[in-house]
Amino acid sequence: MHILHIASSPRGERSVSLKLASRYLETLTSLHPESTVDVLDVWTIDLLPFDGPALEAKYADLQGVQMSDEQQAVWKQIHALGERFHRADVILFSVPMWNFGVPYRLKHLIDSVSQRGVLFEFDAQGMRGLLKGKNVVVFASRGVALGEDFPTEAYDHQVAYLKTWARMVGIPTIDAVLSEATLADPATAEANFTAALAEASKLAAAVQP
């Protein structure tokens, strides 16, 4: 089993979402020691600006126009990034909530790699995702708890966004574990985190290779 872990918090070992993902991976690899993990840290990877040559390459591809050498080089890098998704059996996101959404570097990664011929295609029925048969697991942290003041259906642009992306690339359902109210009083934050850790272990134990 091969896991692609997309780490999107810049806080390192202090990150709640990363701690949850680490618990999941520790449990999973202890049960399936043959598993391999590819860590894609959005804060350390060299993401190309998606403008200029990258944008022109995108439209050249869509329109069937010959790319320049510069555009071909950029497009080759995007395909290489996409291969990391294709090689994975499990795509794992550890993601904090920033302003009700995801960190901008994660959005940059997704915008770069989600291209025709990389993660999806068009056919007679419309868009067809190319990552069918894979699992997506999201470990999400939130400083506040969504609820009465901030209804989930209106304010969740974190897990809901990743669900939408997963459907676009051919993965109809995802598993998500939340640790909310990380900025609340210590007792509340710790209780939520402890429950989320247990859920992460349980989710990993249920994985079938």
From Swiss-Prot:
Cystine connections: none
Keyword Iron-sulfur carried by entry: no
EC number: 1.6.5.-, 1.7.1.17
Cofactor binding: number and manner: Binds 1 FMN per subunit.
Cofactor: FMN
Statement: the UniProt record of this protein carries the keyword Flavoprotein: yes
GO molecular function: electron transfer activity; FMN binding; oxidoreductase activity, acting on NAD(P)H as acceptor; oxidoreductase activity, acting on NAD(P)H, quinone or similar compound as acceptor
EC category name: oxidoreductase
Free-text function comment from the UniProt entry: Quinone reductase that provides resistance to thiol-specific stress caused by electrophilic quinones.
Name the record gives this protein: FMN-dependent NADH:quinone oxidoreductase 2
Keywords assigned: Flavoprotein, FMN, NAD, Oxidoreductase
Similarity section: Belongs to the azoreductase type 1 family.
Subunit structure: Homodimer.
